[in-house]
């Protein structure tokens, strides 16, 4: 189950986070502004975040296999159709809906499956599973950049459509519904979502998402405008992914022995401080340092989000709870990259846009500080089972 989840997330997010490699070719072909082009990625994130509660509920009710298989077909169709668009706004529909739905169908059901199958070492298993996102990020952008340079962006999307569909269908065939003996929730689903702890998680996640997706869209073009080659620019997104693998696996394993909420807060702090490095990054080596630090914090955030939900609320209906939390990412993503693009277009500089992302990331950490008071009592130490 862990291997299937790892591979599924690698395929889904490898496609989604490769968008930065397609950004400049599409910007040039359609003659659009940065904000309008980046909206294609933002819509993708909004769709996968908004569909999280739906795919989580469907997985809880009907099992993950049919949900993941459906996502495979939808993602493949969306990518294939994107290769044929002649207007940018059509990409909002084909790429935004297709890739967004595919990611939603892969991520939440797979995370819920791993959380349900494991009791002991649950956090380690979750950390390994979501490390697939980082591995996909490592591979996706550089592979896309190399393919685009030889085949063009349209043919590359066709290749991605075929590969992602085949991989996700294989993962769907392997995955099985977890046993029914999951840890029961302390409170009812509606009460959990309305609780102060969940509200803090949600607000913090909105703010961090505003910052998080900015480098995935703009870091390659930022590096290119500062003298880096196309491949070296795209490789920065891969470095973020590589560092996030270490963050996901390392912190996921450490959470089995340390306080999961405090590690979660530390991940947000590291992520926030990394934007200060980017703000002072006129040279490629400093950009690499930013990518490494940001990736480590990002990896901890992604790896520990499911663990924090299980820790605070139990694993009963975990897919639905995670889906509800992940809608926050959609709101943040819809604001972050388009706003950054608008600022860059208006000022002709990345500096103010990076500073705005820095401020949003700091705010996300501040919002998370009170979360420690809501740690569960010792009778249900879910994260340490």
Residue ranges and their predicted role:
Residues 212, 238-244, 249-250, 255-308:
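C-terminal transmembrane helical hairpin of 12-TM major facilitator-type secondary transporters
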Residues 42-57, 238-250:
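Central cavity-lining transmembrane alpha-helices of secondary-active solute carriers
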Residues 50-88, 255-261:
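Conserved MFS/SLC helix-loop-helix module at the cytosolic interface between two early adjacent transmembrane helices
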Residues 128-176:
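Helix-loop-helix hairpin linking two adjacent transmembrane segments in secondary transporters
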Residues 10, 78, 90-105, 206, ...:
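Hydrophobic core of transmembrane alpha-helices in multi-pass small-molecule transporters
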Residues 19-24, 196-249, 253:
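Extracytoplasmic gate region of multi-pass secondary transporters
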Residues 26, 104-118, 300-313:
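Intracellular juxtamembrane helix-capping segments at the cytosolic ends
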Residues 26-27, 58-59, 137-151, 156, ...:
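Interfacial helix-cap and linker-helix signal at transmembrane-aqueous boundaries
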């Amino acid at each position: 189950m862990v291997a299937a989840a790892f591979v599924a997330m690698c395929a889904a997010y490898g496609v989604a986070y490769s968008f930065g490699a397609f950004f400049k070719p599409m910007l040039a072909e359609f003659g659009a502004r940065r904000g309008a082009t980046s909206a294609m990625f933002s819509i993708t994130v909004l769709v996968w975040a908004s569909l999280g509660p739906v795919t989580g509920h469907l997985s809880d009710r009907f099992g993950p296999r049919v949900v993941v298989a459906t996502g495979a077909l939808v993602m493949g169709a969306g990518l294939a159709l994107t290769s044929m668009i002649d207007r940018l706004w059509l990409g909002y529909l084909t790429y935004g809906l297709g890739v967004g739905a595919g990611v939603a169908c892969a991520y939440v059901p797979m995370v819920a499956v791993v959380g349900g199958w494991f009791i002991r070492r649950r956090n380690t298993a979750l950390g390994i599973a979501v490390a697939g996102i980082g591995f996909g990020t490592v591979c996706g952008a550089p592979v896309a950049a190399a393919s685009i340079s030889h085949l063009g962006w349209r043919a590359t999307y066709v290749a991605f459509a075929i590969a992602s569909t085949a991989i996700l269908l294989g993962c769907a065939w392997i995955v099985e519904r977890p046993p029914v003996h999951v840890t029961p929730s302390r409170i009812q689903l509606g009460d959990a979502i309305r609780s102060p702890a969940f509200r803090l998680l949600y607000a913090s996640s909105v703010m961090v998402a505003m910052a998080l997706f900015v480098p995935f869209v703009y870091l390659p073009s930022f590096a290119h405008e500062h003298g880096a080659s196309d491949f070296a620019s795209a490789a920065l997104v891969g470095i973020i992914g590589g560092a996030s693998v270490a963050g996901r696996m390392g912190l996921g394993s450490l959470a089995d022995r340390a306080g999961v909420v405090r590690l979660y807060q530390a991940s947000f702090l590291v992520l926030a401080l990394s934007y200060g490095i980017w703000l002072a990054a006129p040279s490629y080596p400093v950009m690499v340092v930013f990518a490494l630090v940001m990736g480590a914090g990002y990896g901890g955030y992604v790896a520990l989000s499911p663990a924090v939900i299980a820790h605070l609320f139990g694993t009963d209906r975990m897919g639905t709870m995670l889906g509800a939390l992940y809608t926050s990412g959609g709101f943040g993503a819809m604001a972050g990259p388009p706003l950054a693009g608008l600022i860059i277009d208006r000022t002709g500089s990345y500096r103010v846009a990076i500073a705005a992302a820095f401020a949003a990331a700091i705010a996300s950490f501040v919002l998370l500080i009170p979360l420690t008071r809501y740690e569960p009592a010792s009778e249900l130490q879910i994260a340490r089972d």
